[in-house]
């Protein structure tokens, strides 16, 4: 499975800045957008509802990580929103992941198109952090592979991973298990605080199911032109 449109990360502090950005696109252009912690904590679920009411698809990226019951109750709320994607940390364990799925279904009365993705390792993580801070005896890629297996076994719909690992997960889990990849940059673009990055066309060749693009579009001189370029590269491989 592959999402046709790049997912634009709306990394803005408030509603005003968000819609100022969205006005740079044609009114009939329906986007796939990601609402993360900053925007959600600033504007709440009303922001999500407004984006959906305007015809946009929403990836609500809150990376839930808590005891199973707390995550289940939070997912009940998310289940009512009608977002396309949402996230939990796989490191919370299989019991938490199963509870997340149950909560989502409960919130949507058993009928939902929302897919839950598990966070493997953040794209800001590198081998040194895995070894010295997380104290894992396996490599970063082996850690990602292990998390992907846990997520699939627990009933999640896919994972968030670096595009460097998407082909590995594709071979491990099959094509129906989603591989959504942030850390996407145009050639020569600023990588910021992300350490594992890739271009849109390379991510497509590496079996990413969907790409999340932030600064390459939101900070561009002409966001619409950048969006068109990213979309072209993503679709053509």
UniProtKB/Swiss-Prot annotation:
The active site is at 63 (proton donor). Pathway: Pyrimidine metabolism; UMP biosynthesis via de novo pathway; UMP from orotate: step 2/2. It is an enzyme of class 4 (lyase). Disulfide bonds: none annotated. InterPro entries: Aldolase_TIM, OMPdecase, OMPdecase_AS, OMPdecase_bac, OMPdeCOase_dom, RibuloseP-bd_barrel. Keywords: Decarboxylase, Lyase, Pyrimidine biosynthesis. SUPFAM superfamilies: Ribulose-phoshate binding barrel (SSF51366). Pfam families: OMPdecase (PF00215). Catalyzes the decarboxylation of orotidine 5'-monophosphate (OMP) to uridine 5'-monophosphate (UMP). This is Orotidine 5'-phosphate decarboxylase. It comes from Ligilactobacillus salivarius (strain UCC118).
């Amino acid at each position: 499975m592959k999402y046709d449109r790049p997912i634009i990360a709306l990394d803005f502090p408030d509603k005003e800045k968000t819609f100022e950005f969205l006005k740079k696109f044609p009114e009939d252009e329906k986007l796939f957008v990601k609402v993360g912690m900053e925007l959600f904590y600033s504007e709440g679920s009303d922001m999500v509802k407004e984006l959906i009411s305007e015809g946009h698809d929403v990836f609500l990226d809150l990376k839930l990580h808590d005891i199973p019951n707390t995550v289940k109750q939070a997912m009940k709320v998310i289940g009512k929103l009608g977002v396309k994607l949402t996230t939990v940390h796989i490191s919370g364990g299989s019991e938490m992941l199963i509870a997340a799925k149950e909560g989502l279904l409960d919130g949507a009365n058993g009928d939902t198109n929302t897919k839950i993705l598990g966070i493997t390792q953040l794209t800001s993580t590198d081998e040194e952090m895995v070894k010295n801070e997380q104290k894992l005896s396996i490599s970063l890629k082996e850690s990602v592979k292990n998390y992907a297996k846990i997520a699939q076994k627990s009933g999640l719909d896919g994972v968030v991973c670096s595009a460097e690992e998407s082909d590995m997960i594709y071979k491990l889990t099959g094509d129906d298990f989603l591989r959504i990849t942030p850390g996407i940059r145009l050639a020569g673009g600023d990588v910021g605080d992300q350490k594992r990055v890739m271009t849109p066309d390379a991510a497509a060749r590496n079996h990413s199911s969907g790409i999340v693009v932030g600064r390459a579009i939101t900070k561009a001189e002409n966001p619409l032109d950048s969006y068109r370029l990213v979309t072209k590269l993503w679709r053509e491989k």
